[in-house]
């Protein structure tokens, strides 16, 4: 993994992308669940 042919390592891109996706999904599900709980 020390072979960084590009400017940004692939593992770094994957980690950042995963964190962003998980964060967006968490916010989306939390908002939908809290919205459903308040409406019901």
From Swiss-Prot:
Give yes or no: UniProt keyword Transmembrane helix: yes
InterPro entries named among the record's database cross-references: PSII_PsbJ, PSII_PsbJ_sf
**Where mainly located?**
plastid
- Pfam families xref list: PsbJ
Q: Which cysteines are joined by disulfide bonds?
A: none
Q: Which GO terms describe its cellular component?
A: chloroplast thylakoid membrane; photosystem II reaction center
Q: Name one GO biological process term.
A: photosynthesis
Its job: One of the components of the core complex of photosystem II (PSII). PSII is a light-driven water:plastoquinone oxidoreductase that uses light energy to abstract electrons from H(2)O, generating O(2) and a proton gradient subsequently used for ATP formation. It consists of a core antenna complex that captures photons, and an electron transfer chain that converts photonic excitation into a charge separation.
Q: Which family does it belong to?
A: Belongs to the PsbJ family.
The record describes its quaternary structure and partners as:
PSII is composed of 1 copy each of membrane proteins PsbA, PsbB, PsbC, PsbD, PsbE, PsbF, PsbH, PsbI, PsbJ, PsbK, PsbL, PsbM, PsbT, PsbX, PsbY, PsbZ, Psb30/Ycf12, at least 3 peripheral proteins of the oxygen-evolving complex and a large number of cofactors. It forms dimeric complexes.
Question: What protein name is recorded for this chain?
Answer: Photosystem II reaction center protein J
Encoding gene, per UniProt annotation: psbJ
């Amino acid at each position: 993994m020390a072979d960084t042919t590009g400017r940004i390592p692939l593992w770094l891109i994957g980690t950042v992308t995963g964190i962003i996706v998980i964060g967006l999904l968490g916010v989306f599900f939390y908002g939908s669940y809290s919205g459903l709980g308040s409406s019901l």
